[in-house]
Design a protein with these regions (language model features):
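Short loop/turn and low-complexity linker motifs enriched in small/turn-promoting residues
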Residues: 29-148
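Short, Lys/Arg-enriched N-terminal segments with co-localized hydrophobic residues
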Residues: 1-5
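Bacterial N-terminal signal peptides that target proteins for export
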Residues: 7-17
Length: 148
């Protein structure tokens, strides 16, 4: 009957939309970061370098994590990517989803003080029942080196 044909068409269209929505969430994207961990600077020249790494993982792997320091974007990290940034004075870091696939993903932020030391941050994804958000946590140098 006509009703069955209409119902089949609706199901086909919804399957297509569901697949279209899931592909960016489940696939792994490359960002602007490096897959190679940066060399950690040990010279105490008064500069503060902040080091970021994005955890590996399946959930949210297709969504790039946009990193902003003091309102300026410094990179978009895919899973297992790294980026560094030099700062002076107090700084504020904000992590959010990049692009259309990042729309609706929760954000996280953290603050720090540039005091001539290196600081290390791990970016992750926390999944709730009906939501997902990026997280940022400060770690030690050894925690950073062991991440992934």
């Amino acid at each position: 009957s006509k009703r069955k044909i209409m119902l089949k068409n609706v199901i086909k269209k919804n399957k297509f939309l569901l697949i279209l929505f899931l592909i960016p969430l489940l696939s792994s994207c490359s960002g602007t970061g490096s897959k190679i961990k940066p060399t950690i600077s040990t010279t105490n020249n008064g500069n503060t370098t902040i080091y970021f790494t994005r955890e590996g993982g399946f959930v949210g792997g297709g969504i790039l994590a946009k990193i902003e320091v003091d309102g300026t974007e410094i990179g978009k990290l895919g899973t297992k990517e790294h980026v560094t940034h030099n700062v002076s004075g107090n700084y504020r870091i904000k992590i959010s989803g990049a692009g259309i696939s990042g729309f609706g993903i929760g954000t996280d932020s953290i603050s720090g003080v540039a005091d001539g030391k290196n600081y290390f941050y791990i970016i992750g994804v926390k999944q709730g029942l009906f939501s997902m958000k990026f997280t940022i946590n400060e770690t030690t140098e050894s925690g950073y080196k062991q991440s992934h």
